[in-house]
Design a protein with these regions (language model features):
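Cytosolic juxtamembrane N-terminal segment immediately preceding the first transmembrane helix
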Residues: 1-31
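Intracellular cytosolic loops and amphipathic helices of Major Facilitator Superfamily
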Residues: 1-8, 195-251
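Extracytoplasmic gate region of multi-pass secondary transporters
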Residues: 36-37, 249-300
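Helix-to-loop junctions at the C-terminal end of transmembrane segments
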Residues: 70-80, 303-314
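C-terminal ends and interior cores of transmembrane alpha-helices
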Residues: 90-108, 325-337
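Glycine-rich segments within core transmembrane alpha-helices of 12-TM secondary carriers
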Residues: 145-173, 187-188
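Conserved small/polar residues in nucleotide/adenosyl-binding loops
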Residues: 346-348
Length: 348
């Protein structure tokens, strides 16, 4: 039954709808993830935060992400990709919205500690978005398209940070940092979109023995009548393995380490960048947000560029080119750390 996906010549409108929904999910949830960098930049002077307090606020989501990835991956295998996706979107949106009620620096629970606690939950929820939406999309897509589609789904991650920068630049003087946290509730819209637009993964349904539901899900993806799809006469065999067996594959371990290194660099720039601009260069929080917009625009352009190269060059060479260019630019950036080009800092 699933082999019908592999015979596709081009993606259907429903498959594109799924890809767009996943992109929107990444954009909105990474808005919530990176918003804290701009809020911390504003609070650094307002609350006279120490380096330790500011650092803990920015680090907190990273504490919640690793266990979150394991948890949501496990949950997605047990209750379904779609349901886990919805729950992760709810988690990150509510955790961000609750920070509207952050007490002041002298409250019973100091404001910085309140932010640390709920940022852990933001990281926990965000790990689910990244862990679940890729398998969900891939299981609706033919194998020969998965590399390209996976790259496309993550293309708008920096756009979430860019939107956070735009919102902070324009709205911070009007609604304050608490108002920015309320905007973080917007990902709840995703819950309704996913609930009504996206069915459960046909591969997961087949693995659970729910063949009729799997047929309807596959028919939705292919945009055909479910009656045109024949049910398999036998259930697919599922081999149970322990997660630790993944470490038997050296290439998988190497890919995981490289992913961790690249994610660390990207996360550091997005979250720590605005605060460092305020602390080191003395910019205003609003101007720091404005400058970060250009960083994130270049990140979006770069992701589209690499995505376009995947089919002609292949996945390995595209990834190699990306890593080499990133390494060269990091060296150049470090060498010219005190040189500014483009926009003048006169308007700080």
């Amino acid at each position: 039954m699933i082999e019908l996906l592999e015979r596709q010549k081009k993606l259907t409108a429903n498959q594109w709808k799924l890809i767009c929904t996943a992109n929107l999910a990444d954009l909105l949830d990474f808005f919530d993830l990176f918003l804290i960098g701009y809020v911390t930049a504003a609070l650094t002077k307002q609350w006279s935060l120490t380096y330790l307090q500011g650092g803990l606020i920015l680090l907190a989501s990273g504490i919640g992400a690793p266990p979150g990835a394991f948890f949501w991956g496990w949950l997605g295998d047990h209750i379904g990709r779609r349901t886990a996706f919805i729950l992760s979107a709810i988690t990150i949106a509510l955790a961000t919205g609750v920070m509207y009620f952050t007490p002041g620096p002298d409250g019973l629970i100091p404001g910085w500690l309140f932010l640390v606690i709920f940022r852990v939950f933001v990281g926990l929820g965000n790990a689910g978005i990244y862990t679940i939406d890729l398998p969900l999309v891939q299981e609706f897509i033919p194998a020969y398209k998965r590399g390209w589609v996976s790259a496309l789904v993550t293309t708008l991650l920096p756009a979430g940070s860019m939107l956070a920068g735009l919102a902070s630049w324009q709205l911070l003087p009007l609604i304050g940092w608490r108002g920015l946290f309320l905007i973080g509730l917007v990902p709840l819209v995703l819950v309704f979109m996913i609930r009504y637009w996206v069915p459960e993964s046909p591969r997961w349904l087949m693995r659970m023995g729910r063949l009729e539901e799997a047929r309807k899900s596959l028919a939705w993806a292919l945009m055909v009548d479910p009656k045109e799809i024949d049910l398999p006469t036998t259930l697919p065999t599922v081999e149970k393995t322990r997660w630790i067996e993944l470490f038997k594959y050296p290439k998988l371990c190497l890919a995981g380490m490289l992913t961790g290194l690249t994610q660390t660099g990207g996360f550091a720039i997005g979250v720590w960048g605005p605060t460092l601009l305020v602390l080191v260069l003395g910019t205003s929080p609003e101007y720091a947000a404005f400058l970060m917009i250009f960083v994130n625009v270049s990140a979006v352009v770069g992701r589209f560029f690499i995505t376009a190269l995947i089919e002609p060059l292949g996945r390995r060479w595209s990834a190699t080119l990306c890593l080499v260019l990133g390494g060269i630019l990091m060296v150049v950036q470090g060498y010219y750390y005190n040189v500014f080009i483009g926009l003048s800092l006169i308007h700080i």
